[in-house]
């Protein structure tokens, strides 16, 4: 086997991200012994798992959530999205920085900070990390009843989450904020990881590209055996290494979803300090900025993020001017 020198830290991750270091599999197995069944030496003689194995990835997530966030019970149903924890944590930490920038550099902690997670999914990872790291109160929304039932099960199985995370069903699949944001409530942040693709065919093509990348990274040829593995993994509704249709694609894809979100945000602009959304494709940004100009957002920020060679970013916008942001802070963050 060949050997290579690996950096101690993963490049690009936020300084407060608990996952900047390479995975300590001995520590993770100690926290969650079932992970041991999936740990093996890769071609570089480093401990790892097979990231193409959905059960291995889910078990790694269970270990990470238990070891670093004290989540004793976490699971997702088959065919739901199993998110990478380090990248999800980065978004949360960057949101904390966004709030701190408007609070004289002081990080707002505690349940006075309210966050709306659009499309929280069955995994509930954003609210878990945000609550455990900063004590924030979360409202998670989704159009999928099964996803919310599973998320509610996670809350119920982990007493520390009770009272800090509430879940709401979005009954209108074409709406984002309408129907879930109540008239009298306010949010300091909204966050969202929007569907990436515009169709099932595009989602399947994206999955094929991921499989090809994984095979290359594992040193495997792209021949008959690889096609046979793909055929087995792609059976049924398994797309993109897990994910329900609404998690992976929607009308208009990422650009269409974000454009609808921006248009709706204007109607509840007084009730939220900062709206934010991940933007996976840099090519989507011009359309996002056009939509924001159309609703006359007061301020727009684009925050770049990276995990190794994977580049991403989120866009944040507010309808509150500078005086309005100061008034918001005085009114809602006095005890933060």
Curated annotation (Swiss-Prot):
Keywords: Cytoplasm, Methyltransferase, rRNA processing, S-adenosyl-L-methionine, Transferase. It is an enzyme of class 2 (transferase). Pfam families: Methyltransf_10. It is found in: Cytoplasm. It catalyses: adenosine(1618) in 23S rRNA + S-adenosyl-L-methionine = N(6)-methyladenosine(1618) in 23S rRNA + S-adenosyl-L-homocysteine + H(+). It comes from the Bacteria. Residues 212-234 are annotated as: Disordered. SUPFAM superfamilies: S-adenosyl-L-methionine-dependent methyltransferases (SSF53335). One of its GO terms (cellular component) is cytoplasm. One of its GO terms (biological process) is rRNA base methylation. Residues 212-231 have a biased composition (Basic residues). One of its GO terms (molecular function) is 23S rRNA (adenine(1618)-N(6))-methyltransferase activity. The keyword Transferase applies. Its EC number is 2.1.1.181. InterPro entries: METTL16/RlmF (IPR010286), rRNA_lsu_MeTfrase_F (IPR016909), SAM-dependent_MTases_sf (IPR029063). Specifically methylates the adenine in position 1618 of 23S rRNA. Belongs to the methyltransferase superfamily. METTL16/RlmF family. NCBIfam families: PRK11727.1 (NF008725). This is Ribosomal RNA large subunit methyltransferase F. It comes from Methylobacillus flagellatus (strain ATCC 51484 / DSM 6875 / VKM B-1610 / KT).
């Amino acid at each position: 086997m060949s050997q290579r020198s690996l950096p101690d830290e993963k490049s690009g991750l936020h300084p407060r991200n608990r996952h900047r270091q390479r995975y300590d599999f001995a520590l993770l197995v100690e926290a969650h012994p079932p992970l041991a069944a999936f740990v093996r030496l890769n071609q570089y003689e480093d401990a790892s798992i097979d990231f193409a194995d959905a059960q291995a990835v889910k078990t790694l997530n269970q270990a990470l959530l238990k070891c670093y966030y004290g989540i004793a019970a976490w699971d997702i149903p088959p065919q739901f999205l199993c998110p990478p924890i380090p990248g999800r944590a980065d978004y949360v930490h960057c949101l904390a920085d966004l709030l701190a920038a408007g609070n004289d550099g002081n990080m707002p902690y505690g349940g006075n900070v309210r966050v709306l997670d659009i499309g929280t999914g069955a995994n509930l990872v954003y609210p878990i990390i945000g609550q455990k790291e900063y004590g924030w109160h979360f409202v998670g929304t989704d159009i999928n009843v099964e996803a919310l039932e599973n998320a509610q099960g996670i809350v119920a199985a982990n007493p520390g989450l009770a009272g800090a995370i509430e879940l709401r069903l979005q009954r209108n699949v074409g709406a984002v904020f309408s129907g879930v944001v109540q008239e009298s409530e306010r949010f300091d942040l909204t966050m969202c990881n929007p569907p990436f693709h515009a169709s099932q065919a595009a989602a399947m093509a994206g999955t094929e590209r991921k499989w090809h990348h994984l095979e290359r990274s594992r040193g495997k040829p792209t021949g008959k055996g690889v096609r046979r593995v793909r055929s087995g993994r792609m059976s049924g509704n398994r797309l993109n290494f897990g994910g329900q249709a609404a998690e992976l694609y929607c009308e208009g894809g990422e650009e269409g979803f974000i454009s609808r979100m921006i248009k709706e945000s204007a109607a509840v602009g007084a009730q939220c300090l900062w709206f934010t959304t991940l933007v996976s494709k840099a090519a989507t940004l011009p359309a996002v900025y056009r939509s924001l100009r159309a609703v006359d957002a007061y301020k727009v920020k684009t925050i770049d993020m990276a995990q190794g060679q994977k580049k991403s970013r989120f866009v944040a916008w507010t309808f509150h001017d500078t005086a309005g942001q100061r008034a918001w802070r005085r009114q809602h963050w006095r005890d933060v």
